[in-house]
């Protein structure tokens, strides 16, 4: 049986941010936010904390295909492997990450629509905390683009509402979290959850292939109080809670993964995100959602970045080509930035 706690609005507001930071600690903290080995179920009346916490904090190790000649079951090795994926263990050296794809609109009873392109990048730096953990310090930007030209959009025509709306891009400065040898623990939910959870070693989902590659998968399913509440943001908010899922895949050279001298790992992979309508689309609480369908990677140079994106970023966001050098606050998600930096759109008046 699940434990239920009465909802308190102030505690929920704190716990939403607490949870977002906890979730961001594993395989992510990206433009649009998250990837972690844990999930949270909430509803409007209560917080529901599952009893089987091991099922949300310890994903299964990649089955029989993962061989034992790399220490896949060693959580300290997994910590360092994750750090080499997310950054570079040559502390102080920054690492480039990139993603590109399409944002699709999904509604019942009709064909899925390609709405906008999406491309972004990040620079990350690691810090050794001296206690077995590492700080990941990140800046990143993500740009919504024209599907035909690849140009960065200033405004967008919404095919569902027949309305042209301003586009709000993603600029997270910073988005930081701590890499540990243990899975992040469920947050306190503003002090409502007092259950003591033991440390659970972090073992990632590795699979080896016959051609010298290693695959890694991870994902997260979230349901949490929205930073944009509909009473204040009637046109931007999808509702009191946000339901978000993210799915990540990574492909590495096994030889590189096995070599600790390769302090920062290159990889290619994919990233998918299922999320409510983006707030700047002004879809309100209408039925449907969006899907980000993207490829991703980390490489030694920025050649994968589209020339148009690089030129736009150099002109408007030059700061984002340099990772932070120290831990700074606040470390917000893109929706938290939206809530602080934007103003609610005027409510449409009826023409009848």
PLM regions: where:
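Targeting-peptide/extracellular-domain and disordered-appendage signature
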Residues: 60-61, 65, 117, 345-352
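C-terminal segment of N-terminal export signals and the immediately downstream linker at the start
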Residues: 13-14, 34-75
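N-terminal targeting and processing segments
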Residues: 64-131
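Mature extracytoplasmic/lumenal regions of exported proteins
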Residues: 237-273
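Predominantly extracellular/secreted and cell-surface proteins with exposed
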Residues: 107-252
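Sec-dependent signal peptide hydrophobic core
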Residues: 23-31
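Edge beta-strand at a domain terminus
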Residues: 268-352
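N-terminal secretory signal peptides
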Residues: 1-18, 22, 40-45
